[in-house]
């Protein structure tokens, strides 16, 4: 993982890289996107009523769509708000499902893959974390181009209110 401040104060770039190896036998990465993959999770004390998600498509269906190039989220913690964007790398497996709808401010990508014993899979994601609202679409696309080496097409960004799943309760 590599952390680097961005040019503007109050922003942080996190590049996440991991490699999975099928050591004991064949490995199938297939579960639900709620409980697998690479996620950002805000602290438990988040104000669930103020969580919003941003998608780079005109009519997002977050429970069904695959392979978003990125997803963004705004959340509030105490009196402060934060924005987070997760950018997917084109080298990651296609068919990636996203969990990006929970009101407790947790979202992320879950790629599906099958590995034979001894094979490896490398996954790369870039997170853009900001104080206040998420960064501009122009900055997201510039970061996406730098991270992936591919100039993205213009997008229509759609904001969706988080679904009211409620903040998970601590187990007794």
Outline where the language-model segments fall.
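Acidic, contiguous internal or C-terminal segments within carbohydrate-active enzymes
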Residues: 1-31
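Residue-level recognition of well-ordered beta-strand positions that form the cores
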Residues: 2, 17-21, 39-41, 124-128
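Cell-envelope and extracellular/periplasmic
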Residues: 8-10, 22-23, 47-49, 128-130
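A general secondary-structure signal for short beta-strands and their flanking turns/coil
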Residues: 11-15, 35, 120-122
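Intrinsically disordered, low-complexity acidic/polar segments
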Residues: 27, 49, 132-136
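Trp/Gly-enriched beta-strand surface patches
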Residues: 33-117
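Beta-strand-rich recognition/accessory modules
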Residues: 84-168
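Short, solvent-exposed mixed-charge patches
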Residues: 170-172
């Amino acid at each position: 993982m590599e952390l680097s401040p961005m040019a503007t104060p109050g922003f942080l770039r996190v590049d996440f890289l991991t490699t999975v190896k099928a050591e004991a036998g064949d490995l199938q990465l297939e579960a639900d996107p709620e409980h697998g993959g690479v996620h950002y999770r805000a602290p438990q004390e988040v104000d669930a009523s103020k969580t919003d998600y941003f998608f780079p498509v005109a009519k997002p269906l977050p429970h069904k769509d695959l392979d978003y190039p990125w997803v963004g989220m705004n959340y509030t913690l105490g009196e402060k708000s934060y924005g987070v964007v997760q950018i997917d790398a084109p080298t990651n497996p296609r068919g990636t499902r996203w969990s990006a709808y929970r009101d407790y401010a947790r979202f992320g990508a879950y790629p599906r893959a099958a590995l034979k014993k001894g094979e490896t899979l490398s996954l790369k994601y870039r997170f853009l974390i900001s104080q206040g609202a998420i960064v501009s679409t122009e900055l997201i696309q510039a970061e996406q181009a730098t991270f992936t080496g591919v100039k993205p097409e213009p997008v229509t960004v759609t904001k969706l209110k988080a679904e009211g799943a409620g903040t998970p309760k601590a187990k007794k």
